[in-house]
Amino acid sequence: MHARAEFCTVIGHIWGWRKRLRVVHGERCPRDMPCVFAQNHVFLLDPFVSFGAAMQSAGILPRFMSRDDFFAEKKQSWWYRLVNVDELICQLGTLEISRGNVSIGQLRPFVNVLRNGESFIMYPGRTRSRSGLIFEYRGEVQEPGSASFFLAQAQRGRETDLDVAIVPLTRTRNVATGIDTVLVGHPLRLAPRAGREEQRALDFQLVEAIAQNVTVNATQLAAGILYLHALHGLEESIGRGGFEAMARAALERVNGRCIDPDARADLPGQVSAALRHFRKAGLVALSRDSIRLDRAKILATPPMDGTFRKLNPVKYSLNQVLHFADVTQAIEDVVLTPRAQCAGGAEQLP
């Protein structure tokens, strides 16, 4: 265990957890009971971020659930040949399952992890998002994976009840700054001897909790402003001052959400970082005083694969908060009002 902790600390330095990972509400992470950490699946290397959040929050060294063919398509990559990633994740405590042929025998080790007082990390099956949306169900999958199954099995057949919980984790990547925010949700529990309907209800409660804990950042707001200008055929050239004023007005209208502290502390700097990032993708052209958008490129929908984020970071960033009606309404309010459509932008916005 100590060797694994030291190894994970080294990995944390490589991935820059101290500088690039922000954990919110880490105090909610249970320290004295086993739990299942369930997180939205964003990138291939999500487990390292989830692990870092658990370590920072409570000093927990959770294991991982990973399918046995996770890196099958990457084995010819230079980085895979340089570092045997399968061996690397085993050092971190990975337990593998076969996605196409899951058996009780493969699931039993995860139940034993909980019964032994340890924890593990999992991601709802077949929901990895490539477009920025919180979940993308693919194939014939129509419901979230059953995290509650492991709680029910860990409690089953015991003389005394086992206190075990599911902890929702929500990862939000600010694509412009590279900062990851992981918000720890309130632990969810399953009543002992709960039936299948109660388990199913808990699984839906889990995905709702994950979805509600996305962090709102300046890059998403900037993306929304640009997208609405493109979608509604508004002016293609926007004043820098007016653009920043719209972003600030939208931010002030958002209440009851986790807000990126960098957006509050330095909104001009965060908006500028977002615009520079969008420029790299060819979506905007920047001058000292104005922003000129490329309407066709902003409205284009890239392939639903790993290139989506790079080809259209405007859509990707906006998709992160698309399920927040209050956030999208705030952006619409500041862009689609008569004063917001005036030449020069939104300097007069309240």
Describe each PLM feature range.
Residues 205, 209, 224-225, 246, ...:
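Charge-rich, solvent-exposed alpha-helical interaction surfaces
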Residues 212-238:
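Positively charged, polyanion-binding regions of nucleic-acid-associated proteins
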